[in-house]
Amino acid sequence: KETYLSRDFRETAAQCFPSQAKELNAFFDARLNVLLAENADASKEKQYHLKRQILPGIAAYETLQRVMPKEEALQTVHGYVEELARTSHKQLAALLRIPGLYRLVPGVFVKSTRSVFGPAAGFDSKELQVGNGIWRVDMMKCPYHDTCVAYGCPELCCCFCDSDDISYAGLHPKLIWHRTKTLGRG
């Protein structure tokens, strides 16, 4: 299934490396298939993150390094992730213009984190404070970080950490998104 990362990668290959695009796409597809096969035994919940973002990100990053320096490849993949995050931010901010809706956000975050970002998906969180419109959590384990480290590209994880910050910071004057650290950025 085509993801935003694979779509954006193919666009970069076609626009920036037209004479090599076919070869780059073939390498990307082959690498992604290997990554998917190596992670086929992961839980359904973890597969959601692996297939949608983590593994296509790794495949794009590795493939781009065939035609550009490592740092440029990292910034290119970061750009893909950032673009999606900015779109997400705009949509969420527009939704939160509905009067009073911001009050539901902490509760929604708690529920979605427990399900989509729970232990079955490879996350381990420690809730520090829940209630009275506040939700504080320490993420102790993250499959984005673990997978990037396992495949020798820990620097790629910051793309996904930054994505959260872009998506959620400044959504509403009465909501504060704040991180002190992430597993990927330290």
Predicted regions and their residues:
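Sparse, context-dependent recognition of short Cys/His-centered cofactor- or disulfide-binding micro-motifs
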Residues: E45, H49, V108-V110, A120-G122, ...
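Short, hydrophobic/π-rich interface segment
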Residues: E127-G184
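N-terminal, charged low-complexity regulatory/assembly segments
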Residues: K1-L64
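Secondary-structure boundary/capping signal
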Residues: A21, E72, L175-I176
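A short catalytic or substrate-binding loop motif that flags glycine-/basic-rich loops and adjacent residues
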Residues: G118-P119, G184-G186
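Amphipathic interaction/junction segments at domain boundaries or subunit interfaces
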Residues: R52, P56, E62-Y151
